[in-house]
Amino acid sequence: MAFLELDHVSVVFPAVQGLLSARKSAPVVAVDGVSLSVEKGEILGLVGESGCGKSTLSRTVMLLQKPTEGRIFLEGEELTALSASEVRKRRPDFQMVFQDPYASLTPLFTVYATLKEALQSRRKRTFAQTRDDVAELMEKVGLSPSLMRKYPHEFSGGQRQRVAIARALAPEPRLVIADEPVSALDVSIQSQILNLLIALARDLSLTMIFISHDLSVVHYIADRIAVMRKGRIVEYGEADKVFSSPSHEYTQALLAAVPRL
């Protein structure tokens, strides 16, 4: 069995009563029967336009959203069968890197405080151990430990995203989900963050789901690609094959939108 396996996962949001109307809206099928797998140490790219269900699927994998149907397995264990208390215990196993690093970091926390909190979620440490572990995390993401007493507003966008990545690594997660982690950054910085994620995945044997609307970015970082449209996976395969010879018309449209030099 694969490291992570999704078996016919669906997420349906129920109809909502309008404030000014007696009519209910139709139920929203955000994720529709998705089945896919991720191998240990692999980067899976999940690509699709806004509103296709990528973020809902990622929240479901992280146990933040309960699926309406289907099952999710991590190393053979059915996550969807866990109780609420068991889910809370597993939170450190799943970490996320968000699109906007400034919004995802607490502005009143120094880097040290942010990383300390993330480290303590896995196990308690002495002051000296915490200081050393914070320094090590910062070095892993290409930041000088001398910056650990600074606040988010004192960093550039790329540096803030490095802090966010360090925070995700702190609890030693089993799975990292990066949701559009470079789309809010300058083009000149995007490749640096992508190369950092590739190096971390290789050096730490990280398993990662990388989410983006940009097929070229996903092709650059991913081992395999899953293309999502209207809640469904319409294409799934090796990254080079999907990028060079897409079989589905939607993937072909995404490829046609990639800028050519």
Residue spans of the language-model regions?
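Helix-to-loop junction immediately C-terminal to a conserved catalytic motif
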Residues: 62
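Conserved ABC transporter NBD signature motif
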Residues: 70-78
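Conserved ABC ATPase "signature" region
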Residues: 78, 128-146, 255-256
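Conserved ABC ATPase signature
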Residues: 151-155, 159
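Conserved catalytic motifs of ABC-family nucleotide-binding domains
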Residues: 172
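ABC ATPase "signature
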Residues: 236-237, 245
